[in-house]
Amino acid sequence: MELSLSMWSVHRTVRENGWTVLDFVDFCNKEGIKQVELLNVFWKNAAIELPTVVAALKSKGIRASSYAVANDFAKDNAEERQAALQEILDAIPVAQALGVNVIRVFSGNLTEHVTYDNALGWIVEGLRAAAEAAGKAGITLCLENHGKLAGSGVQVKAILDRVNSPYLKSTFDTGNFLLVDEEPLTALDVLIGEVAHVHFKDFVRLPDGRYKSLAGTSFEGVSLGLGDVDLAEIVRRLKARGYEGAYVLEYEGLGSEAEGIRKSYEYFGTLL
């Protein structure tokens, strides 16, 4: 069991210092991190950068564990929904070049112009088409619990059941369930048979936290083991179920991202 690092964990550094994907790979190499998750949102020009990044990963002995996209099917415009599908389709050859067989996907964002029922139909339609294409390439799409459309365990399970594809599973984000006022262990009871990818994240309840739940509770991101998520029990239950996929750190705390990442890796070592 090894902890992979999502590039999202340094998203503030990327924004503030103009980091490229290659800069992230260099950071991981210096930190001794041997597994990474890359995201399509961080490419400046994927066609140009990808071969260089693949070569850098190989030369530094770093393995990509997964790839992630930020598609949104909750659009009342058919062309926008097609663009969301294309975003996933375009990720398939990138994932193959990186040597990964898991792509994290989203459902979409609920807005005042879109009803839940309409959005659910569009999400199912889009993910079904995407999963069919991914399956032909030997890749599994993993739907993250994120936002209001696929935020709870029951919502994610409903989408997976309707798509009904062996190539669409769950990215179990340990922290995001708190933002829809659901205990992560409760969600795990619902999804444990569907989990093929884990985003390891911790949140703590704080009055001035930046992240608000649907009920108005404030949370802040912290290093693993410093928050309210029972990460040790999640790992125990997944191990008992035979889970052998990746655990991917998504650090979303304040302060130094590098230090938050280091503390998270130290904590993860106590779970081994």
Locate predicted features.
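N-terminal pre-domain/capping segments
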Residues: M1-A97, N118, S165, K169, ...
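Histidine-acidic metal/acid-base catalytic patches
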Residues: M1-G32, V124, A150-F172, N176-L272
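Short, small-residue-rich loop/turn micro-motifs
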Residues: M7, G61, A68-N71, R104-N109, ...
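Short histidine/acidic/glycine/proline-rich micro-motifs that form metal-
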Residues: V10-R12, N40-N45, A70-K75, N109-L110, ...
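Active-site acidic/histidine proton-transfer and metal-coordination neighborhood
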Residues: D26, K58-R63, K75-S170, L179, ...
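Conserved beta-strand positions in the central sheet of alpha/beta enzyme cores
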Residues: E37, S66-A68, R104, C142, ...
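Short amphipathic alpha-helical segments at helix-loop
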Residues: D72-D76, T111-T115, G216-F219, L249
